[in-house]
């Protein structure tokens, strides 16, 4: 499955001195001389001022202006803001175009927010009770194209706060008024006009609607205003936008292939898992074939961890709320925790959102010596976390999940080796499971101090340890400021699903906080008691999320060792059913998962049904194979080989044992 690609070009950089008395010079004035022989392309600018904007923004002597020519797909100025990417600028401008079209077609509509997102954009609308569906999208898109062809400029203005509120109030745009009150600081408000349409926005934008040529509206969804379930539910319209029609066409083809691989679709088609409203959203049911795959994954994970010195334990799914008060989760993680179960005697029990407090208690069941360290406690433990219904997605984001979790208790001088060992284990799991493309993110804290436990020095030490571990292993990484856990920084292994959405699959975290909160000590070699360090790690992540990734990675055609049905034995006629059963029994004796198809159906039908289930091998038996004790083996490439039954048993047993892909 190929993704649409755009060949990168070197960004054009322009330095120009503008006389102070010409303060009204537009940023667009320099664009024609900057364009390398292609006329005047779409552009955006960045300026050191509160509101960025390309057309109506003036510049003063001593200020610098950056012009992004939009035939440069990915300029790199060493910054990471979304507006530094001209493709994001184009998509954000297309979101404004969408809102302008909606307001023309539905004057009563109230518009919320419309950002650029990965591969596209969206805008949230309140249609006043009117139902809007995907059947309405062609008309909206048609109006967008009419506005685009009208060559309407994006005009940036800075209004006094009072005037901005009045402008939106007279349009009855209550959500924009609310945003000004809640989000905009100071006495000036940055807005953009596109014809009669007015939006609250910092920019930047393309020069004109005429620069928006390759876009398409994709789907409609519901979304609570500002992500709050207590606020009105709005209609969210998603779209995509690209610089050229060819890139748009490539992207749409990519989506067609991604849809075929979507784990929610394949999970239903292959009968791997189900979701039922009677059970509840985000609470998937593992069906027999899905549960078989999960057992294989867990067996593989546990066996490898045991071979690396981990001790596997079992702990309960609930604990007293006081345990999570001591760990800090009740104070700093409560939005993801379920309400406690309260009893008449005053006891409060909590569904656990994490496993670490339980493993800490196991550590404290006896006095530990330096000889006991490092102590690696592991578990595939059930966790329960509240997620808003709008964020739930198949198996990828759920409310109940089983986490491949471990906590390593070690001395400070053992820390580096343990972090590197955890990274190595995650790499090994990725190699065997076929997670070929991933990236590292070093997730650190931000400056909001009440979100984090511990001192700045402790955080710096922990972050340095993780960075050093990655660098010593030759791994590159990016930083995710503000993405750390509340008790410490972490390394996140980021992977992408079939739709290129990024998510965290594995983590390694260094924690100096919980050892302090739980007074975790060990007896050192000199007989004194010392504080130990704790490493949290989830080398394979949650079983549900890993499962969703593997479904899409293999499009349901799992490697033989993972597939719930490794062989289908198909008889050509009823008279060979007894031999088919013998073949099935021999395979089962070698711990091969097999189904014997003795239905009174044509052989082509039996093969077709096995192919739909993406079974790795089909062993056909008939008048030629039965007397000789052979099987005719068909694999997923349609390669056919007749061989003795024992040779086939040896071949498939080796493939399963070696976990070949």
Question: What are these model-predicted stretches?
Answer:
Residues 2-5, 9-22, 27, 31-38, ...:
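Low-acidity, Ser/Thr- and Arg-rich intrinsically disordered low-complexity segments
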Residues 14-16, 21, 49-52, 58-110, ...:
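NTP/phosphate- and nucleic-acid-binding module
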């Amino acid at each position: 499955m190929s993704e649409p690609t755009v060949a990168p070009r070197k960004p054009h950089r322009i330095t120009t001195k503008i006389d102070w008395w010409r303060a009204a010079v537009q940023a667009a004035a320099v664009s024609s001389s900057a364009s390398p022989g292609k006329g005047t392309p779409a552009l955006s600018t960045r300026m050191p001022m509160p509101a960025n904007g390309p057309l109506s923004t003036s510049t003063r002597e001593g200020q610098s202006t950056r012009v992004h020519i939009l035939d440069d797909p990915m300029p790199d100025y060493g910054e990471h803001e979304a507006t530094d990417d001209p493709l994001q600028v184009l998509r954000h401008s297309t979101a404004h175009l969408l809102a302008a079209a909606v307001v023309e077609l539905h004057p009563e509509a109230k518009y919320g927010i419309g950002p650029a997102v990965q591969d596209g954009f969206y805008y949230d609308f309140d249609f006043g009770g009117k139902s809007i569906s995907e059947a309405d999208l062609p008309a909206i898109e048609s109006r967008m194209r009419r506005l685009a062809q009208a060559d309407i400029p994006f005009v940036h203005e800075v209004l006094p706060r009072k005037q901005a509120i009045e402008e939106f109030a007279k349009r009855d745009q209550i959500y924009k008024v609310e945003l000004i009150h809640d989000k905009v600081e100071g006495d000036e408000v940055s807005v953009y006009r596109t014809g009669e349409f007015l939006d609250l926005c910092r920019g930047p934008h393309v020069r004109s609607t005429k620069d928006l040529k390759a876009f398409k509206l994709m789907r409609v969804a519901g979304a609570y205003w500002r992500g709050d379930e207590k606020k009105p539910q709005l209609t969210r319209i998603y779209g995509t936008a690209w610089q050229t029609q060819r890139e748009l066409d490539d992207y749409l083809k990519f989506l067609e292939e991604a849809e075929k691989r979507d784990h929610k679709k394949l999970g239903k088609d292959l009968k791997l898992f189900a979701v039922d409203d009677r059970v509840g959203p985000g609470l998937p049911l593992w069906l027999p074939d899905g549960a078989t795959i999960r057992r294989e994954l867990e067996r593989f994970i546990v066996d490898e961890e045991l071979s690396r010195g981990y001790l596997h334990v079992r702990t309960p799914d609930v604990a007293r709320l006081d345990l999570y008060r001591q760990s800090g989760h009740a104070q700093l993680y409560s939005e993801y925790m379920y309400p406690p179960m309260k009893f008449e005697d005053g006891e409060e029990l909590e569904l656990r959102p994490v496993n670490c407090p339980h493993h800490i208690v196991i550590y404290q069941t006896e006095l530990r010596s330096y000889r006991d360290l490092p102590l690696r406690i592991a578990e595939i433990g059930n966790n329960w976390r509240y997620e808003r219904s709008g964020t739930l997605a198949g198996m990828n984001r759920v409310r109940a999940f089983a986490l491949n979790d471990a906590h390593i208790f070690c001395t400070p001088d053992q820390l580096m080796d343990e972090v590197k060992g955890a990274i190595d284990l995650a790499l090994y799991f990725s190699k065997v499971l076929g997670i070929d493309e991933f990236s590292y993110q070093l997730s650190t804290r931000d400056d909001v101090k009440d979100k984090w436990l511990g001192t700045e020095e402790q955080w710096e030490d922990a972050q340095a340890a993780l960075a050093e571990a990655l660098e010593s292993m030759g791994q590159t990484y990016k930083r995710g400021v503000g993405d750390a856990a509340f008790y410490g920084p972490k390394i996140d292994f980021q992977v992408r699903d079939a739709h290129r959405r990024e998510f965290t699959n594995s983590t390694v975290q260094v924690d100096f906080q919980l050892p302090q909160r739980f007074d975790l000590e060990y007896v050192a070699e000199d007989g004194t008691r010392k504080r130990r360090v704790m490493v949290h790690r989830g080398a394979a992540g949650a079983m549900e999320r890993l499962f969703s990734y593997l479904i899409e990675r293999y499009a349901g055609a799992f490697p033989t060792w993972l597939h719930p049905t490794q062989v289908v034995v198909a008889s050509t006629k009823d008279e060979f059913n007894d031999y088919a059963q013998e073949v099935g029994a021999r395979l089962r004796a070698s711990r091969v998962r097999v189904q014997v198809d003795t239905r009174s159906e044509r052989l082509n039908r039996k093969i077709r049904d096995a192919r739909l289930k993406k079974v790795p091998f089909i062993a056909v038996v008939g008048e030629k194979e039965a007397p000789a004790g052979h099987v005719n083996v068909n694999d997923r490439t349609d390669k056919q080989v007749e061989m003795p039954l024992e040779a086939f048993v040896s071949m498939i047993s080796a493939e399963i044992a070696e976990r070949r892909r």
